[in-house]
Design a protein with these regions (language model features):
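Cytoplasmic helix-loop-helix junction between adjacent transmembrane helices
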Residues: 109-145
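Juxtamembrane intracellular "pre-TM" segments in multi-pass secondary transporters
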Residues: 1-7, 191-225
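C-terminal ends and interior cores of transmembrane alpha-helices
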Residues: 80-100
Length: 226
């Protein structure tokens, strides 16, 4: 018998996806403006804005595979989230502070690399801690949190930008420092995975026992027919 879905943990995990949404909305809206302050080349601006897609082609599957084969006391996915998400947040907060094109390009390039290194482990964490029959519900909660993050940054971020162009980036950057700690404290990945594996092994043993009993009950009938 499967356990009930722990909505508290799913909402906590959804906070990570909320922050991801809060990162990309201001980035896509304001990064072209920042670049336009230093260059009038639309080709360069379009190229820089495509860095995340280029990075995703290589980094997402690479770090997905790396996290699959990672063995630590805190789990497989959590190390990437706990280390790389805050680092990405710091780089993200530095973007609007750059005063030269070269420094802006370097910080932006590093940000796109680092943020891609924790996205796949974040996505993979959900099926690791949620049973198969509950994953559609969990996915719905996570998508809701992502949408909520977009709404928050659209309404709040635009007002912050009017006050100071760096404030929307500071907000998402600060949350990128806080949320990984919350995830680490509330989602004990290694413990959940171990318990799920024990439960799976128990179910397999029970199914095997039932199959053996059924086969034993059939043997006298087969002998009588023979």
């Amino acid at each position: 018998m499967s356990s009930r879905l722990n909505y508290f943990k799913i909402f906590d995990l959804g906070l990570g996806f909320m922050v991801i949404s809060m990162i990309w909305a201001p980035y896509n809206a304001y990064m072209p403006i920042f670049l336009g302050n230093f260059t009038k080349s639309n080709t360069l601006i379009r190229f820089v804005m495509s860095w995340d897609n280029i990075a995703n082609l290589f980094i997402l599957p690479l770090f997905g595979a790396l996290s699959d084969n990672t063995e630590t006391r805190i789990g497989r996915r959590m190390p990437y989230i706990l280390i790389n998400m805050p680092l990405a947040g710091v780089l993200y907060a530095l973007i609007p502070l750059r005063t030269k094109l070269l420094s802006l390009l370097v910080i932006d390039f590093l940000f796109n690399i680092v943020v891609a290194t924790y996205r796949t482990p974040m996505v993979a964490l959900m099926p690791d801690i949620v049973e198969e029959e509950h994953r559609s519900k969990a996915n719905g909660v996570i998508n809701f949190m992502g949408g909520l993050g977009s709404l928050i940054i659209v309404f709040v971020g635009s007002q912050l930008y009017k006050t100071n162009k760096a404030y929307p980036f500071f907000l998402s950057g600060i949350l990128s420092l806080i949320i990984p700690i919350i995830l680490f404290l509330t989602i004990k990945e290694s413990k959940i995975v171990v318990n799920r594996e024990k439960e799976r092994q128990s179910i397999l043993k029970l199914k095997h026992f039932i199959a053996v009993v059924k086969n034993q009950n059939k043997e006298p009938l087969l002998l009588w027919i023979l």
